[in-house]
Amino acid sequence: MSRIGYKVVNLPEGVEVKQDGNVVTVKGPKGELTREFSDKITIKVEGNEVSFERSAEDNKTKALHGTTRSNFHNMVVGVSEGFKKELELRGVGYRAQMKGKTLVLNVGYSHPVEFEEEEGITFETPSATSIIVSGINKEEVGDCAARIRATRAPEPYKGKGIRYVGEYVRRKEGKTGK
């Protein structure tokens, strides 16, 4: 049984929490995030500590307890520090570049693949073969990075494609000739 829901979240300096029923707003130096949580979990803000209590002991509520605490913690980290995902391109001629607020990928298709910056998400290309996706919402940063990776996922024979930095791609052996 996980006990993550019982851990108290400490608020860093410059982060403030407003609660309106089940809707919680976290404001910090990087921005502001609002989220609606389940009414089965009670959120208590005391000074610079936030605790979570569940109303029932059924399995659904127990699962929500830890999830609520983790989601809230991610909101606090997002508005104070932010999140980023780094991707790298491997393959001959695979390149990424920024054109204004648009990320343009040349990844072996007959056409370049373009991604517009969404609200709260920024792209950086420190080199032609690396991309950094950053923002304050962990879910949105992860989803956006996953969509970029899905345009050309790493293939198992040569390892070409877009991958997360540090991701291990399991390689396969090619066909053996006669």
From Swiss-Prot:
GO molecular function, one term: structural constituent of ribosome
Keywords, ordered alphabetically: Ribonucleoprotein, Ribosomal protein, RNA-binding, rRNA-binding
GO biological process: cytoplasmic translation
Subunit and interaction comment: Part of the 50S ribosomal subunit.
Signal peptide: none
Organism whose genome encodes this protein: Ligilactobacillus salivarius (strain UCC118) (Lactobacillus salivarius)
Stated name of the protein: Large ribosomal subunit protein uL6
Organism superkingdom: Bacteria
GN (gene name): rplF
Keyword tRNA processing: no
GO CC annotations, alphabetized: cytosolic large ribosomal subunit
Family, per entry: Belongs to the universal ribosomal protein uL6 family.
Pfam families: Ribosomal_L6 (PF00347)
UniProt keyword annotation of Ribonucleoprotein present: yes
SUPFAM superfamilies xref list: Ribosomal protein L6
Function: This protein binds to the 23S rRNA, and is important in its secondary structure. It is located near the subunit interface in the base of the L7/L12 stalk, and near the tRNA binding site of the peptidyltransferase center.
PANTHER family (UniProt xref): 60S/50S RIBOSOMAL PROTEIN L6/L9, LARGE RIBOSOMAL SUBUNIT PROTEIN UL6M
PROSITE patterns for this protein: RIBOSOMAL_L6_1 (PS00525)
InterPro entries to which the protein is assigned, alphabetical: Ribosomal_uL6-like, Ribosomal_uL6-like_a/b-dom_sf, Ribosomal_uL6_a/b-dom, Ribosomal_uL6_bac-type, Ribosomal_uL6_CS
